[in-house]
Amino acid sequence: MIYQSPTIQVELLEDNIAKLCFNAPGSVNKFDRETLASLDAALDSIKQDSNIKALVLTSSKDTFIVGADITEFLGLFAQDDAVLLSWVEQANAVFNKLEDLPFPTASAIKGFALGGGCETILATDFRVADTTAKIGLPETKLGIIPGFGGTVRLPRVIGADNALEWITTGKDQRAEDALKVGAVDAVVAPQALEAAAIQMLKDAVAEKLDWQARRNRKLSALTLPKLEAMMSFTTAKGMVFAVAGKHYPAPMAAVSVIEQASTKGRAEALQIEHQAFIKLAKTDVAKALIGIFLNDQFVKGKAKKAGKLAKEVNNAAVLGAGIMGGGIAYQSASKGTPIVMKDIAQPALDLGLNEAAKLLSAQVARGRSTPEKMAKVLNNITPSLDYAAIKHSDVVVEAVVEHPKIKAQVLAEVEGYVSEDAIIASNTSTISINLLAKSMKKPERFCGMHFFNPVHKMPLVEVIRGEHSSEETIASVVAYASKMGKTPIVVNDCPGFFVNRVLFPYFAGFNGLLAEGGDFAAIDKVMEKQFGWPMGPAYLLDVVGLDTGHHAQAVMAEGFPDRMGKSGTDAIDVMFENKRLGQKNGKGFYVYSVDSRGKPKKDVDPTSYGLLKDAFGELKAFEADDIIARTMIPMIIETVRCLEEGIVASPAEADMGLVYGLGFPPFRGGVFRYLDTMGVANFVALADKYAHLGGLYQVTDAMRTLAANNGSYYQA
């Protein structure tokens, strides 16, 4: 053994080829500080052994290296610039040491080689992947750029245009696609991986492959003609800004870094990367996006832990077909759990099956599935008009019409057809789980399971704990949601649960602006372009449906009359009473037509303005800051109330619920990250300026205490 540490082992193989194996404790290899230090020491040992003729990098895991240890980032990025620069320079010295070894090097890549893992393989002369490999630099998704030489080496390996696409999108690349652009030199079967990499090194040692020429290309400036370079980078800037926009600076910074470094050798090019990396690491956007990543890991970790208490779900059922039932059936079947789709009407079953078939056909058309896989998924969906079909179901999801009496009746019926230990969950967005549980003989086997529409696109599922729901019931539904590919958060029962409870105060703020003459299209523009929502409140209400919004608003008013009670007609009432239901009937705040791609196209409609003018008077202009404050303050305070009341267990789960359930702007990180960035004391001072608008604008006593103590919701 040439070198050994808890994360890396180096041994000498035959023909004097050294094998460096990444072998960290745990299921995957990460580039944490310990691994980086071990790699540095291992390379020193390798350099000192004069017998070594070549080096192959391997992994003992199913993956190569998944990237840096992101749990270290927030603490590290909070350090002074000088400390951060020192860390980046030391890390890059290790990668340079690997690249400068006096003999050929190769990487044997299986599974993920992402971020620092990708930058590791780029520092070797040859790269061999097996068919499971996925390679990429996802750093821009975290608000930063690659910091271990990725922006320098990748363009010199695969060309500037390809590198710009890889780095600015942050997408993983399959082995076959990486081979096409030259990121890897060969793709082989998993069992042949190490042997293929070693053979490539033998050929290099025998001078059949010119490893030094490859290395020199990475050490030199890009060989791009001046005009071609100008066109390439100008085009990239336009395309990247069109996608990333002003709120996400990292992709544009990546283009700029690659452009500036294109005429430099390695040392100068790396300095350009270092400076841009440090600048981005200090941004609120990076803190927010890294926070989302860590929160996502936290939520998934909780779900995995809950799985230990879960009843195994081998068969499922959904009651109520149509679009929602069909979406749930598709999601379950496509992730491997057979499901019965039960309804009382054949047309509804046909609609549900058609919905599943449509979603699968779209997957086939995009090349993400095959006709054979589509047939297998459809065979996992069993439509039925008979309750007898659900008798072997481990979990039954009730998804009938959103009416308490109808749901209660169906739930009571279901218990008579399933086994004693079957779990029943209601897909409801507003109806109390405790209320529905009153119709159940075994309320401990019952909880809520709130899917968001469209089911196949929305990652969040709210699992609602009723006062009688058992831990096994909650754990089993959490595990089933995870198995379906969803991110579950557990919330306690209350009107609107978590997501809708915090959404409707936002709509109340919007209604308040319109009642004073606000222009709904102008408000949407501010909330989309400046705050960063994917849809402004008027557009969102049109998509949700004004009938749904009207009903849910009434539920919230009844549940929280002190804050959400209504004293008169509001804009949602005006639209609903004039049968303007939104996209579903082609007219709401906006009017809708179908564009050339078959997608809904919205236009401003004078009729809407006329109805609102009759109700509230002439239009009045509001400043953007005023619009943001009046809509967001109620949502933020209600989110804090949910945490204080234990409706949601942690800031991390609340923020993931907002990002995944409502599309809260990821670059702001969620309500609690937004509060911490703004400063709780600053928010309290802002809210107090609007306190005259009513209960929704009154901060809690606990918020005032936190503000007075200069506290925050996140510890890092």
Curated annotation (Swiss-Prot):
<comment type="function">
    <text>Involved in the aerobic and anaerobic degradation of long-chain fatty acids via beta-oxidation cycle. Catalyzes the formation of 3-oxoacyl-CoA from enoyl-CoA via L-3-hydroxyacyl-CoA. It can also use D-3-hydroxyacyl-CoA and cis-3-enoyl-CoA as substrate.</text>
</comment>
<dbReference type="InterPro" id="IPR006176">
    <property type="entry name" value="3-OHacyl-CoA_DH_NAD-bd"/>
</dbReference>
<feature type="binding site">
    <location>
        <begin position="400"/>
        <end position="402"/>
    </location>
    <ligand>
        <name>NAD(+)</name>
    </ligand>
</feature>
<dbReference type="Pfam" id="PF00725">
    <property type="entry name" value="3HCDH"/>
</dbReference>
<dbReference type="Pfam" id="PF02737">
    <property type="entry name" value="3HCDH_N"/>
</dbReference>
<dbReference type="GO" id="GO:0036125">
    <property type="term" value="C:fatty acid beta-oxidation multienzyme complex"/>
</dbReference>
<dbReference type="InterPro" id="IPR001753">
    <property type="entry name" value="Enoyl-CoA_hydra/iso"/>
</dbReference>
<protein>
    <recommendedName>
        <fullName>Fatty acid oxidation complex subunit alpha</fullName>
        <ecNumber>4.2.1.17</ecNumber>
        <ecNumber>5.1.2.3</ecNumber>
        <ecNumber>5.3.3.8</ecNumber>
        <ecNumber>1.1.1.35</ecNumber>
    </recommendedName>
</protein>
<feature type="site" description="Important for catalytic activity">
    <location>
        <position position="119"/>
    </location>
</feature>
<keyword id="KW-0443">Lipid metabolism</keyword>
<comment type="pathway">
    <text>Lipid metabolism; fatty acid beta-oxidation.</text>
</comment>
<feature type="binding site">
    <location>
        <position position="453"/>
    </location>
    <ligand>
        <name>NAD(+)</name>
    </ligand>
</feature>
<dbReference type="Pfam" id="PF00378">
    <property type="entry name" value="ECH_1"/>
</dbReference>
<feature type="binding site">
    <location>
        <position position="343"/>
    </location>
    <ligand>
        <name>NAD(+)</name>
    </ligand>
</feature>
<feature type="binding site">
    <location>
        <position position="660"/>
    </location>
    <ligand>
        <name>substrate</name>
    </ligand>
</feature>
<feature type="binding site">
    <location>
        <position position="500"/>
    </location>
    <ligand>
        <name>substrate</name>
    </ligand>
</feature>
<dbReference type="InterPro" id="IPR050136">
    <property type="entry name" value="FA_oxidation_alpha_subunit"/>
</dbReference>
<keyword id="KW-0276">Fatty acid metabolism</keyword>
<dbReference type="InterPro" id="IPR012799">
    <property type="entry name" value="FadB"/>
</dbReference>
<feature type="region of interest" description="Enoyl-CoA hydratase/isomerase">
    <location>
        <begin position="1"/>
        <end position="189"/>
    </location>
</feature>
<keyword id="KW-0560">Oxidoreductase</keyword>
<dbReference type="InterPro" id="IPR006108">
    <property type="entry name" value="3HC_DH_C"/>
</dbReference>
<dbReference type="GO" id="GO:0016509">
    <property type="term" value="F:long-chain-3-hydroxyacyl-CoA dehydrogenase activity"/>
</dbReference>
<comment type="similarity">
    <text>In the C-terminal section; belongs to the 3-hydroxyacyl-CoA dehydrogenase family.</text>
</comment>
<comment type="similarity">
    <text>In the N-terminal section; belongs to the enoyl-CoA hydratase/isomerase family.</text>
</comment>
<feature type="binding site">
    <location>
        <position position="324"/>
    </location>
    <ligand>
        <name>NAD(+)</name>
    </ligand>
</feature>
<keyword id="KW-0413">Isomerase</keyword>
<dbReference type="GO" id="GO:0004165">
    <property type="term" value="F:delta(3)-delta(2)-enoyl-CoA isomerase activity"/>
</dbReference>
<comment type="subunit">
    <text>Heterotetramer of two alpha chains (FadB) and two beta chains (FadA).</text>
</comment>
<dbReference type="InterPro" id="IPR029045">
    <property type="entry name" value="ClpP/crotonase-like_dom_sf"/>
</dbReference>
<dbReference type="GO" id="GO:0006635">
    <property type="term" value="P:fatty acid beta-oxidation"/>
</dbReference>
<dbReference type="InterPro" id="IPR006180">
    <property type="entry name" value="3-OHacyl-CoA_DH_CS"/>
</dbReference>
<feature type="active site" description="For 3-hydroxyacyl-CoA dehydrogenase activity">
    <location>
        <position position="450"/>
    </location>
</feature>
<keyword id="KW-0520">NAD</keyword>
<feature type="region of interest" description="3-hydroxyacyl-CoA dehydrogenase">
    <location>
        <begin position="311"/>
        <end position="716"/>
    </location>
</feature>
<keyword id="KW-0511">Multifunctional enzyme</keyword>
<feature type="binding site">
    <location>
        <position position="407"/>
    </location>
    <ligand>
        <name>NAD(+)</name>
    </ligand>
</feature>
<dbReference type="GO" id="GO:0004300">
    <property type="term" value="F:enoyl-CoA hydratase activity"/>
</dbReference>
<keyword id="KW-0442">Lipid degradation</keyword>
<feature type="binding site">
    <location>
        <position position="296"/>
    </location>
    <ligand>
        <name>substrate</name>
    </ligand>
</feature>
<dbReference type="InterPro" id="IPR036291">
    <property type="entry name" value="NAD(P)-bd_dom_sf"/>
</dbReference>
<dbReference type="InterPro" id="IPR008927">
    <property type="entry name" value="6-PGluconate_DH-like_C_sf"/>
</dbReference>
